[in-house]
């Protein structure tokens, strides 16, 4: 089944190429911004955007996976609808043509007849991409295709993508904002159990050539199925974090000052959570944009924990990273349920699942992570972190 993961790596790189191509030329990029309709808006942001790049990426992933694995394209779900309305009021369903010329014709309708822009985009969409990881060649795992579902966030952190800041200074390796926070997220889950099985995170904008102004990216993946756990971060990226993790394992977790966790949070995090975190983490609280990027910071060992207490992340935001973290021995859990859970009962941690929507919810809210989330690399670390967090949270905070 590594052939599915290999293909996901390839289409994620094609997606990254589209994201870079759309961002490269400012005049083209301005044409691509479409405001989202009311039912599709993420309520966290006053203004949220749907870009043609978003829709193109999602359709490219669907089309490519369906061509290679018939039937799988119908089980790919994501944030974006594929409907556009152009300046003439025409409703256009975005479907990729089998040829570059047919895609040009459709894109021309979306872009109000702008042939040059349509040709430039169609070329990237139909361009062959050769991208794989030799580490997957030796992997032989048989996962039945009919149990697989796929969540896609074609361009996570759309606001940072549109803003396009390229000169943000990182804080201990973590970018608070900017193009580095943009990710392409593809998560594969078991449609029967909701357990994440495979994840790909492609970061299209990692480093920029100062002469050509062109960007290079990076891709990360993980697979966790029936006891087989492999990922692209062997050996681990951050030796700093490894040594800290080892020291945390040897120190007394009940000793308040013995060690500090590092945590990455959203700038919009609740004051009650931030206040408690200041006791648990001290100065090691980092702010960053994008749910995918914050999860990636945990995967890369730049932070121990990603915590988010609100209900404005969704299945497509978390599935890819969750699968990679599972392959690393970590996971992603429901924050509200964790805070209400009695660790002495021996019950399993409330892992996020991906196959059922929220009862009674409509639109995107049916796929929201309603209880918030915590992403982590080590279960032992998480248990210690939660016990300390609860010591500093007012009782009301666990029920909001």
UniProtKB/Swiss-Prot annotation:
| Impact noted for substituting residue 54 to A | Does not alter affinity for 1D-myo-inositol 1,3,4-trisphosphate. Decreases about 100-fold Li(+) sensitivity. Loss of inositol polyphosphate 1-phosphatase activity
PROSITE patterns per UniProt: IMP_1 (PS00629), IMP_2 (PS00630)
Q: What is its EC number?
A: 3.1.3.57
Q: Where does 1D-myo-inositol 1,4-bisphosphate bind?
A: 156-158, 268, 270, 290-291, 294, 312
- Which residues make up the binding site for Mg(2+) 2? 153, 317
- For whether the record's keyword set contains Hydrolase, the answer is yes
Regulation of activity: what does the record state?
Inhibited by Li(+).
Q: Name its pathway.
A: Signal transduction; phosphatidylinositol signaling pathway
Gene Ontology MF, one: inositol-1,4-bisphosphate 1-phosphatase activity
Instruction: Tell me the residues on which Phosphoserine occurs.
Output: 318
Cofactor field = Mg(2+)
Could you tell me where the Polar residues compositional bias lies? 238-257
- State the CDD domains in the record: IPPase (cd01640)
Instruction: Quote the Gene3D superfamilies the UniProt record gives.
Output: 3.40.190.80, Fructose-1,6-Bisphosphatase, subunit A, domain 1, Inositol Polyphosphate 1-phosphatase, domain 1
What is the similarity comment for this entry?
Belongs to the inositol monophosphatase superfamily.
What's this chain's function?
A: Mg(2+)-dependent phosphatase that catalyzes the hydrolysis of the 1-position phosphate from inositol 1,4-bisphosphate and inositol 1,3,4-trisphosphate and participates in inositol phosphate metabolism.
Name of the protein this chain belongs to = Inositol polyphosphate 1-phosphatase
